[in-house]
């Protein structure tokens, strides 16, 4: 991670940290780095439903146009929609304005290369070096060499038609409850599932610029669980603000997280001969029960650091086609180049249709270890990881576990938080381990 780029692009409080002035520079320098070898390059831009999206989009567009790039605005669309369309429309770069599952005051900017993949560390470092230069020495085209802007608001439908082709039959006879987090999927997901002839119930589909992720979406699936039970739905599907995550709810109202969705997909893909190298790529945050379930089905697992970009890097390196995170980023590399909530949802419902099994039965084949994750707001993430008292309490707890569980303490990639996670045979033991570590972290480096 650099000075500006975190694990998922540039993030910050809109108009305070992520200002229009910075967005202009990111557009100008990012556009230059990604398109400098092309004459009249094309760059596409999408955004989620945050009120700050228009402000940042205007600044980004200006920065891109100043390099001579032709800019195509997609309007409100999901992050994977931008990734797909970047490649499908032959653009040199794609840009998404979103802070994903973060609250409304935050926003972010992430780039995709012409292949639809997120940027490499080297590309981000090149952009950062330009951002830090005191003098902007980039070429400044004038007159007819300046870029122009156009709108392509039909892009969302083009993307939906593409992912719809990945399922084998329609969803008639199924009742599906959707929670779109008042975000980018609000006008996409209901259309997609209705088009596949499912009966649908919806929530979180009334974005007003202020309510994205507010008590709804993939970070609050318990709200969708109530809707599933109330409507008697067969499955609930919760997306986050930019549509790159999926958390599901079974017909009984139980939450089905990213680990369980990955396991269900892995087992089905293995049975149907689709799982490349018989391997799933996940992060160190995945539940122990996930690894045990894979092992029981003779499926190999490959672990990476936390962040879907690291999962993707490992998938590309090893030639794998399934990976993801417990948080609901599921990457199906046969179809798309980033985590995709709606695509994952299609595959999950398709597996229910093809196996004729309810989601509770499919998810029940994986037994989760009790887990607790606590986020501690800190003054300095780096100091926390170097603190001797924090290191000591982690060592003591790991010794007590004696291999029967695990502890993970790591910094957030996007916020001033330390995440403390434990898994153990019982919830009581698990909670005890976490709270002991949290108390020390708070005492040593906790923010007010």
Curated annotation (Swiss-Prot):
PROSITE patterns: PGM_PMM
EC number(s) stated in the UniProt entry for this protein: 5.4.2.10
InterPro entries: A-D-PHexomutase_a/b/a-I, A-D-PHexomutase_a/b/a-I/II/III, A-D-PHexomutase_a/b/a-II, A-D-PHexomutase_a/b/a-III, A-D-PHexomutase_C, A-D-PHexomutase_C_sf, A-D-PHexomutase_CS, Alpha-D-phosphohexomutase_SF
Family: Belongs to the phosphohexose mutase family.
Modification after translation (UniProt): Activated by phosphorylation.
Protein name as annotated: Phosphoglucosamine mutase
Cofactor details (free text): Binds 1 Mg(2+) ion per subunit.
UniProt binding sites for Mg(2+): 100, 240, 242, 244
Modified residues (Phosphoserine): 100
An annotated GO BP: carbohydrate metabolic process
Catalytic site: 100 (phosphoserine intermediate)
Keywords: Isomerase, Magnesium, Metal-binding, Phosphoprotein
Protein's job: Catalyzes the conversion of glucosamine-6-phosphate to glucosamine-1-phosphate.
Species of provenance: Bacillus mycoides (strain KBAB4)
């Amino acid at each position: 991670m650099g000075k500006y780029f975190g694990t998922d692009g540039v993030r910050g409080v809109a108009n305070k940290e992520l200002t229009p002035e910075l967005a202009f520079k990111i557009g100008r320098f990012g556009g230059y780095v990604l398109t400098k070898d092309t004459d009249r390059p094309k760059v596409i831009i999408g955004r989620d439903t945050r009120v700050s999206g228009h402000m940042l989009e205007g600044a980004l567009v200006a920065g891109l146009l100043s390099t001579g790039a032709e800019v195509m605005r997609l309007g409100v669309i999901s992050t994977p929609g931008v990734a797909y369309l970047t490649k499908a429309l032959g653009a040199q770069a794609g840009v998404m304005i979103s802070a994903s599952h973060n609250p409304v005051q935050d926003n972010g900017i992430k780039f995709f290369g012409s292949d639809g993949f997120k940027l490499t560390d080297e590309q981000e470092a090149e952009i950062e070096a330009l951002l830090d230069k005191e003098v902007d020495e980039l070429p400044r085209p004038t007159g007819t060499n300046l870029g122009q802007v156009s709108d392509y608001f039909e892009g969302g439908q083009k993307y939906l038609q593409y992912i719809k082709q990945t399922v084998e039959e329609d969803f008639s006879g199924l009742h599906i409850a959707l929670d779109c987090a008042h975000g980018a999927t609000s006008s996409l997901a209901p259309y997609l599932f209705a088009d596949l002839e499912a009966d649908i119930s919806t929530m979180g589909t009334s974005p007003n610029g202020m309510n994205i992720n507010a008590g709804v979406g993939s970070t609050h699936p318990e709200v969708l669980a109530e809707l599933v039970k109330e409507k008697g739905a067969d499955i609930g599907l919760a997306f986050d603000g930019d549509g790159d995550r999926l958390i599901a709810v079974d017909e009984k109202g139980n939450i089905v997280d990213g680990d369980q969705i990955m396991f269900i997909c892995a087992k089905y893909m293995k049975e149907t001969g689709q799982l490349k190298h018989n391997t799933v790529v996940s992060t160190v945050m995945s539940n122990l029960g996930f690894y045990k379930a894979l092992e029981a089905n003779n499926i190999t697992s490959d672990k990476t650091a936390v962040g879907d970009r690291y999962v993707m890097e490992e998938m590309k390196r090893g030639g794998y086609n399934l990976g993801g995170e417990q948080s609901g980023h599921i990457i199906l590399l046969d179809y798309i180049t980033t985590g995709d909530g709606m695509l994952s949802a299609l595959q999950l419902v398709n597996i229910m249709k093809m196996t004729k099994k309810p989601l509770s039965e499919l998810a029940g084949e994986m037994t989760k270890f009790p887990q607790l994750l606590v986020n501690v707001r800190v003054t300095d993430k780096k100091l926390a990881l170097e603190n001797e008292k924090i290191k000591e309490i982690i060592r003591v707890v790991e010794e007590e576990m004696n291999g029967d569980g695990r502890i993970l303490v790591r910094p957030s990639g996007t916020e001033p938080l330390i995440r403390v996670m434990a898994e153990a045979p019982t919830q009581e033991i698990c909670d005890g381990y976490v709270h002991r570590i949290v108390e020390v972290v708070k005492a040593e480096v906790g923010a007010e």
